[in-house]
Amino acid sequence: MSSGRIVQIIGAVIDVEFPRDSVPKVYDALTVADKGLTLEVQQQLGDGVVRAIAMGGSEGVSRGLAVENTGAPINVPVGTATLGRIMDVLGNPIDEKGPINETERASIHRKAPKYDELAASEELLATGIKVIDLVCPFAKGGKVGLFGGAGVGKTVNMMELINNIATEHSGLSVFAGVGERTREGNDFYFEMQEAGVVNVDKFDESKVAMVYGQMNEPPGNRLRVALTGLTMAEKFRDEGKDVLLFVDNIYRYTLAGTEVSALLGRMPSAVGYQPTLAEEMGVLQERITSTKTGSITSIQAVYVPADDLTDPSPATTFAHLDSTVVLSRDIAAKGIYPAIDPLDSSSRQLDPLIIGQEHYDTARGVQSVLQRYKELKDIIAILGMDELSEEDKLTVSRARKIERFLSQPFNVAKVFTGQDGKIVSLKDTISGFQGLLSGQYDDLPEQAFYMVGSIDEAIEKAKKMKEKAA
């Protein structure tokens, strides 16, 4: 292995000089032995100098320090040894539970599966969340994005999906925390223990592996931690298992790239993003796919800066997804949670040939009623409800009930709401909304539909409200 020395340090980017006949390849891992720091080569600048990103803090690193070339990209533990463990970007355990004792390691950089290896599935993944199952159903082996600005509930929605799917799911899960709050990662770990998905006494009985590169970490960690998690998920998939991959948050992956892009000497692109934004996103997303041996179903939270869905980062992510769940600040302001916008959210699965005519007609019926209500809002604001035709008054009444029926108490939010979470089957979801569209429940007050599970609960709630009023 060749060795070199540090010649320049600019924050997270470090230049290292090697003998000209043994220059490291791009993506090779370098180690600063004295500091226990790993670097990843990004560019070859010529004259034996390479530019690398530090996978850790560069404090205390000085010019002239010796650097060793490992001759290979960053390798992380893969396989069942990772289950129940929390690891960092390099695959080192950070849960204070001893070494990982892996039998196999894999490079975090690899090519996406070839076209003839890919497999598509039309099987639906039931989430138990009414609004998702109705208007933007998830495909098993598909890619899902949860889009939303700050504080509208991306992480809570993701935690509920993990609670509903991962705990019921017979396969394995990988959770990659990319640049999010350490507190949330900590809460998630203990929730998984309570649910029995993580067994700290017998790791081999655990069903989830966790990889964290949190907000306080240098950009190198946040840039590569998603690839570390994906590498672990790929190994399970290639062994023929069905894997769930949760990534919170894809935007922080992009942001980490933006932070180091200028330091790497690249010219900024639109809104200051790196010029390689689409390529970096493609490299990650093309690997998150299902093959003929196994499937990866990924659920990714995507932060939307300033609630602008046309921002280059979320806009680039849209192209890769099968289902997009858009969280709306306006809906959250009404107190309707989950604050999912049924008009903005979409899914490739919303096709009568896949989900059936009944489900399709119900979903489109709900969307058309809500769209009509949206159009009438301006008239109502100026002239009031009295100026509407009888037909429009009925539409508004049904739309308001539908809006409230799209809300649902979550298990993970029980500490805030004091209500037990509800999981609603797809059959109950469809029949409930069909009844609302057909006018079956026109006589019930709209408040009866707020924060309930199935339609039977709404009817029961209406009865109690009537008794109270009497």
From Swiss-Prot:
Domain of life, source organism: Bacteria
Cell membrane found in the keyword field: yes
Keywords for the protein's UniProt record, in alphabetical order: ATP synthesis, ATP-binding, Cell inner membrane, Cell membrane, CF(1), Hydrogen ion transport, Ion transport, Membrane, Nucleotide-binding, Translocase, Transport
Residue numbers binding ATP: 148-155
Record note on quaternary structure: F-type ATPases have 2 components, CF(1) - the catalytic core - and CF(0) - the membrane proton channel. CF(1) has five subunits: alpha(3), beta(3), gamma(1), delta(1), epsilon(1). CF(0) has three main subunits: a(1), b(2) and c(9-12). The alpha and beta chains form an alternating ring which encloses part of the gamma chain. CF(1) is attached to CF(0) by a central stalk formed by the gamma and epsilon chains, while a peripheral stalk is formed by the delta and b chains.
Listed Gene3D superfamilies: 2.40.10.170, Bovine Mitochondrial F1-atpase, Atp Synthase Beta Chain, Chain D, domain 3 (1.10.1140.10), P-loop containing nucleotide triphosphate hydrolases (3.40.50.300)
SMART domains (alphabetical): AAA
Function: Produces ATP from ADP in the presence of a proton gradient across the membrane. The catalytic sites are hosted primarily by the beta subunits.
Enzyme nomenclature, EC number: 7.1.2.2
One Pfam family cited in the UniProt record for this chain: ATP-synt_ab_N
Membrane topology term: Peripheral membrane protein
Subcellular localization(s) per the UniProt record: Cell inner membrane
CC per GO annotation: plasma membrane; proton-transporting ATP synthase complex
Family membership noted in the UniProt record: Belongs to the ATPase alpha/beta chains family.
Catalysis: reaction(s): ATP + H2O + 4 H(+)(in) = ADP + phosphate + 5 H(+)(out)
Protein name as catalogued: ATP synthase subunit beta
SUPFAM superfamilies in alphabetical order: C-terminal domain of alpha and beta subunits of F1 ATP synthase, N-terminal domain of alpha and beta subunits of F1 ATP synthase, P-loop containing nucleoside triphosphate hydrolases
CDD domains for this protein: ATP-synt_F1_beta_C (cd18110), ATP-synt_F1_beta_N (cd18115), F1-ATPase_beta_CD (cd01133)
Molecular function per GO: ATP binding; ATP hydrolysis activity; proton-transporting ATP synthase activity, rotational mechanism
Organism (species): Saccharophagus degradans (strain 2-40 / ATCC 43961 / DSM 17024)
